């Protein structure tokens, strides 16, 4: 099971996970009859507050290989349980709840389960709420938070800090974000709606934010050296860009026997758009898989007797990686034999 370094998660989903998930339901109102004496139909909103385990599991799904429709194929329940440090039974029970709240749908497959993150396509709609980037190492820290309300608050801080990005662009000195007591009461359970409890929940510190409660407001700022998902991904983009260009040069040297690609023949075959595509593939499949597939492609395209012109390096690399992953998947033991 491939886990991406960064996940794109809808801001509306983060908002609901840190608060309540709304599910709309049509009911008959027998106290309000129509002209024919029949009960009228009213739409009501049900509010569901997810558990820590359910929140973690839905976020985790975003780190798997999700296509543009929100579909993830052949996921091992055993591997999900291992990643979240829970039982397979918990994974299955969580899926039932997530499906009931219409956040996911799922079905069994020969290699495990197929999952659809229902609202995923809406993250990228022009008039939607947008998405934020979350790094997997940050997610690993979040799921270690024991108190579910502290987890909800930390997710809300991620959301607020990301939303404050535009404000910081105009005034870099304004790097502090805040959550007022009134805002806090909107997304937390009623039994936490007093300042002493808010103070206690906010005391949970992580590597990302330095948090201080002053009066009735939670103030927080990124710790020195810490980066949010958007900043970390930009840094990784630059690293991967350099790594891919170096890999192209090193592959030429190894296959040609020359000390360097002095004429730039090989590098000139790769346009900036090609490098950008390979960087994106590195986020999806990992830089080492991309470099391995790149080596095979360069060998076939430039150093074999039946070499052919490659017009789409990104598409070709993706195909090579998928073939290798498909081969590995075929060798796996069916999930039914390993799950309990």
Where are these regions (language model features)?
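Electrostatic interaction modules used in gene-expression and signaling proteins
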Residues: 91-95, 99, 106, 144-340
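Short recognition helix of helix-turn-helix/winged-helix DNA-binding domains
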Residues: 1-79, 86, 99-101, 110-179
């Amino acid at each position: 099971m491939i886990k991406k370094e960064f996940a794109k998660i809808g801001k509306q989903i983060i908002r609901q996970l840190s608060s309540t998930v709304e599910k709309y339901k049509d009911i008959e109102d027998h106290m309000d009859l129509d002209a024919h004496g029949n009960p009228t139909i009213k739409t009501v909103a049900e509010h569901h507050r997810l558990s820590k385990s359910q929140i973690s599991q839905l976020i985790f799904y975003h780190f798997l290989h999700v296509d543009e429709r929100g579909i993830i194929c052949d996921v091992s329940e055993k591997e999900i349980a291992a990643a979240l440090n829970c039982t397979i039974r918990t994974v299955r029970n969580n899926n039932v709840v997530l499906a009931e709240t219409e956040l996911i749908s799922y079905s069994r497959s020969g290699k495990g389960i197929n999952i659809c993150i229902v609202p995923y396509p809406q993250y990228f709609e022009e008039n939607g709420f947008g998405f934020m980037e979350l790094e997997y190492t940050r997610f690993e820290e979040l799921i270690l938070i024991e108190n579910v309300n502290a987890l909800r608050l930390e997710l809300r801080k991620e959301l607020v800090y990301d939303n404050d990005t535009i404000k910081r662009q105009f005034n870099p000195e304004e790097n502090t974000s805040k959550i007022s007591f009134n805002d806090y009461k909107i997304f937390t359970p009623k039994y936490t709606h007093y300042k002493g409890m808010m103070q206690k929940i906010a005391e949970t510190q992580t590597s990302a934010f330095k948090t201080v409660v002053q009066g009735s407001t939670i103030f927080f700022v990124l710790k020195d050296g810490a980066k949010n998902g958007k900043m970390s991904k930009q840094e990784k983009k630059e690293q991967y860009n350099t790594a891919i260009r170096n890999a192209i040069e090193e592959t030429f040297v190894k296959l040609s026997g020359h000390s360097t690609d002095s004429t730039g023949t090989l590098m000139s075959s790769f346009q900036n758009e090609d490098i950008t595509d390979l960087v994106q593939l590195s986020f999806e499949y990992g830089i080492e898989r991309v470099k391995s597939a790149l080596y095979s492609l360069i060998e076939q395209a430039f150093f074999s007797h039946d070499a052919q012109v490659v017009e789409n390096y990104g598409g070709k690399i993706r195909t090579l990686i998928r073939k290798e992953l498909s081969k590995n998947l075929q060798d796996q033991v069916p999930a039914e034999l390993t799950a309990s």
